[in-house]
Amino acid sequence: MINVLQEKTYIKMNKCVLNFKNDLNKIRANRATPELLDNIFIDYYGTHTALSKLSNIIIENNSTLKISLFDISIKNSVEKSIINSNLGLNPISSDSNIRIKIPALTEQRRKDIVKIIKNDAENTRISIRNIRREANIQIKTLLKEKEINQDIEKQVKLEIQRYTNLFIKKINDILSIKEKELLTI
């Protein structure tokens, strides 16, 4: 029972960190990454479909993405979706491909993005602490129901606190790396 609780707590905390990391990967620095287009969807024969499912997206060079569509008939829809995505990207159409030149970030925009990711990091830390709180409540319930004794309660609470410290450190490390990446010209 306790092992399952510890394992579930670890898995939930790990998911929070992975989601945070995935969200940060979508935020661009001065490099073109295919993940930048992960949130672009196209209405493909009545189905809301991710661009990545309808094309190959490759890095052509440091500042250019190349989209090779599987179905050329959706090229106009893809271009409109990219323009309407509020990512500040302008697609350039050529034969069956679409190229996207990633514009350089201004210093002010970099600072704004850093503020946003710091806020996201804090929200992720709060989620980690809430998971810890939920686990501690479950531990107290088990103690009240006499399914565990006080020694086990203390051991498990310490272990969950170690998880909390570990994942908050991971969040801080990921944030630090992304912050340096964004502020480096």
Swiss-Prot record:
GO terms for biological process: cytoplasmic translational termination. It comes from the Bacteria. One of its GO terms (molecular function) is ribosomal large subunit binding. It is found in: Cytoplasm. Keywords: Cytoplasm, Protein biosynthesis. GO terms for cellular component: cytosol. Responsible for the release of ribosomes from messenger RNA at the termination of protein biosynthesis. May increase the efficiency of translation by recycling ribosomes from one round of translation to another. Belongs to the RRF family. This is Ribosome-recycling factor.
